[in-house]
Design a protein with these regions (language model features):
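C-terminal, charged and often intrinsically disordered regions of DNA end-processing helicases
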Residues: 1-135
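Metal-dependent nuclease catalytic regions and adjoining charged, substrate-binding loops involved
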Residues: 5, 11, 268-318
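An acidic intrinsically disordered interaction segment
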Residues: 80-100, 219-236, 295, 310
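Short acidic (Asp/Glu) and glycine-rich catalytic loops that position anionic groups and cofactors
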Residues: 99-105, 241-245, 280-289
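A non-catalytic, helix-rich entry segment at domain boundaries
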Residues: 127, 131-212
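Short amphipathic alpha-helical face segments that pack within enzyme cores
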Residues: 134-135, 259-267
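Generic solvent-exposed, charged/amphipathic alpha-helical segments
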Residues: 189, 193, 261-265, 307
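Non-catalytic protein-protein interaction segments used by genome-maintenance enzymes to assemble
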Residues: 210-262
Length: 318
């Protein structure tokens, strides 16, 4: 496999950029025979290779030191206690999602946003990138569940309308001028075409679950690390890495999207005591994907990053 991630490291397999039209068949190789082209001469869907990479080595899934999670949490608790001391005991709880790991939230890998980690501002409550990201994630959940999308914009809006936290966004899209709405619909068609090619079709035994929320309270709940997995598959087994996590980026910086996925892997480690086995990152705008093992060094690196960022917060964040 051609490696185009920022740098090569153990356990990481990254796809090349998608081929340009007319450049011929594109077959990914990753240490095993690549899926055979279809009878029409087209390459097999990338989702077959993503699934193969997630399954590879599943019979020898690693065990982790039972004390790993406790050690990581202790490190974070110390940093959170220092932050609480700076903010004051009466300060409201601080909810921190992956976006707090970089100083420029506008350049975030994906402006997902939640009720406690909003993206919009008073002057621009529904930034275009955020709206697009939410619509694409709604479609991604539909692809995982049903394997098909009939009307990208219509299906995505239907999903947002039944979500109390997103219904106002659906009304905002309904009220867009015709030209802006058409441009959004055209953009969604490109993203969903790539997602249909990238997203594996998981059997029920994989226990696929979308929008899996995780929150880790620190310092007695005064600091909460939180995030949302786009997709988790597998059943947790104490002491053994068994889960696979799939993350989605809709067009932001690849390195930041990967960091956000490592952050979520850390939260899962703190929640269950065991990290995920493997991570996959899908880029819906470019049609790229990457698959990597979760290593202890990834977890320690992301904890170090979190601790550094916590040390920069204080009274201004209250």
């Amino acid at each position: 496999m051609v490696l185009v991630a920022p740098q090569q490291e153990q356990g990481a397999l990254w796809s090349p950029s998608p081929p340009t039209p007319g450049s011929g068949a594109f077959v990914v190789e990753a240490g095993r025979p690549a899926p055979a082209p279809s009878e029409a001469g087209r390459p097999a869907p990338a989702r077959d290779e993503v699934l193969a990479l997630l399954r590879d080595g599943s019979g020898q899934r690693p065990r982790f030191d039972p004390g790993l999670s406790g050690g990581l949490r202790a490190w974070l608790e110390d940093a959170a206690a220092d932050l609480v001391a700076r903010r004051g005991e009466d300060a409201p709880p601080l909810f921190l999602g992956p976006r707090f790991l970089w100083n420029d939230p506008v350049a975030a890998a994906d402006p997902v946003g939640t009720a406690v980690d909003p993206v919009g501002t008073a002057t621009d409550p529904y930034p275009t990138g955020w709206v697009r990201s939410c619509l694409i994630r709604a479609l991604f959940a539909q692809v995982v569940t049903t394997g098909q999308v009939d009307s990208p914009l219509g299906d995505a809006l239907d999903a947002l309308r039944v979500d109390p936290g997103r219904s106002a966004m659906a009304r905002h899209v309904d009220e867009l001028p015709g030209e802006a709405r058409s441009a959004l619909a055209a953009s969604l068609r490109i993203h969903i075409e790539n997602l249909m090619n990238l997203t594996p079709r998981f059997a029920a035994g994989w226990l696929p679950r979308t929008h899996d929320r995780v929150a880790i309270p620190l310092a007695g709940g005064r600091v909460v690390l939180n995030g949302v997995f786009d997709l988790l598959v597998g059943a947790p087994v104490p002491g053994r890495a068994t889960l696979c996590a799939l993350g989605l980026t809709t067009g932001g910086r690849w390195a930041q999207a990967r960091t956000a996925l490592h952050y979520l892997a850390l939260l899962e480690t703190l929640r269950s005591g065991t990290p995920p086995f493997r991570l996959a990152l899908l880029h819906s705008a470019a049609g790229r994907y990457g698959v990597e093992d979760v290593l202890e060094e990834h977890l320690r690196t992301i904890v170090s990053h979190v601790v550094v960022q916590l040390s920069t917060l204080g009274d201004r964040d209250a």
